[in-house]
Amino acid sequence: MNLSAQLHETAANFTSKPAFIFMDRETSYTEFNHAVTQFADGLQSLGIKQGDNVALLLGNSPHFIIGLYSLFRIGATAIPVNPTYTPDEISYILKNGDVKAVIALDLLIPLFEKIDRILPSIEHYIICPSEVSERPVPEDLSISSKMKSFTSVILGGSGSLIEAETAEEDTAIILYTSGTTGKPKGAMLSYRNLYCNARDVADYLGINEHDRVITVLPMFHVFCLTVSLNAPLMNGGTLVIIPKFSPKEVFHVARKYDITLFAGVPTMFNYLLQYPEGKAEDFQSLRFCISGGSAMPIALLKNFEEKFNVIVSEGYGLSEAAPVTCFNPIDRPRKPGSIGKSIIHVENKVVNELGEEVPPGEVGELIVKGPNVMKGYYKLPEETAATIKDGWLYTGDLARMDDEGYFYIVDRKKDMVIVGGFNVYPREVEEVLFAHPDIAEVAVIGAPDPNLGEVIRCFVVSKQASLTEEELIDYCIERLAKYKVPKSIDFMEELPKNTTGKILRRALRNTVLQQS
């Protein structure tokens, strides 16, 4: 169940077919598999062995894919890290993750000089170019003796790679959560977790060797890893790698390469919808699009499908589940606002505070079971025990299921707002506001109130400078119960987002707390 072993088979079946395209350069499956073997051999020659933890601080590039699959091939554990994290965030993950080696962008060399003083246990820094051409590794730095270029590692192998014999429950990857409730936690995913979720996603969506997939979601994010990387690669598909999201580039690539599948977060779909030069003809080869990462407003989904004449299948997942648990069917009725039904081999159910399943239509916590559920959190047995009970992963998301087995995310459990004893789910208010023709983006949070405990506070990005707070509040009064109507509405140039484009409610909450 090691994806790197699967690559041998895929490369044998699709020898000259492009595995990925980057900067208009095609790399065949044979070339990809050979590069993985060479780099894995080079890593082994450096003393990196099965069970060692190795961090990847890279953007979307062939270096990431080759590095990841090389680590799988020698049985080392990969720790993908967002390279745009702050120095403190990166340092924490490298220390907590017991990292032995780092594969990273050359832009981070100054940071590693500082980190090496507090983490001398890191033995190797393998440097990848941030530009198209590779520059020589500096020789006058305090960590120069630990640094090697990506190319030199590929060329420095012994020529006699010993591939690891991994067990299906061995840890393949550690994904650090975004740390919305404190320090990031490392979700340990096994080879079985990764393989099964990629296989089941590919089966559910019908991904095959004829698919050409835009890979623009960050590769260090689990959504991209499974849907836009592992699933296509294990089935002979072709990745078209875009280093950084831009509507112009997505439309260009979709048209040039007859893209059949695009996966993104709702913010990306919103930008594509608003891009004035985007045309339905650009997406004419798309079989469908996939939305995940956060809830997609129903109005956005309908407007996108109508403008571009393409199906958008909304799904659901989380790092701890490798990540996918649900998708809206491609070949059967889809329900706007729903995350769809359980994918094959995965169970989802909604339970109350006692862990008892609730009837259809009733709101409770969504829990998940299947071969995709993580082993646990790295070095955190108590948090693991609180999250996984009797094999069920407690997601922290509030949901309901209808009579036909379709699930609906109501909101994050921690995001629910209690106004005078009444429960208000931010997404419900956001859906109402997003349907307003002059609203581009919206986020809703709870703000402290001395009388009601909490009140609803909204943050919006407007398409029209003339739009007023009073107008929007009146709009909400007509469509929402009184206790759900926003107490105030703030207009912003842009809402805070993480690197995948997900709106950060916690940043807005921090702003409110600082103001109070």
Each model region followed by its residue ranges:
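AMP-binding/adenylate-forming catalytic core of the ANL superfamily
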Residues: 85, 262, 354, 370, ...
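Conserved AMP-binding A3 loop
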Residues: 28-30, 172-196
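Conserved AMP-binding/adenylation subdomain of ANL enzymes
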Residues: 195-212, 220-261, 271, 275-276
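Structural core segment of the AMP-binding/adenylate-forming
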Residues: 8, 25, 45-46, 66, ...
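Gly/Ser/Thr-rich phosphate-binding loop
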Residues: 259-264, 273-334, 347
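ANL superfamily AMP-binding
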Residues: 16-17, 31-55, 86-87, 91, ...
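AMP-dependent adenylate-forming
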Residues: 5-28
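Conserved pre-ATP/AMP-binding loop-to-beta segment of ANL
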Residues: 16, 126, 145-149, 154-176, ...
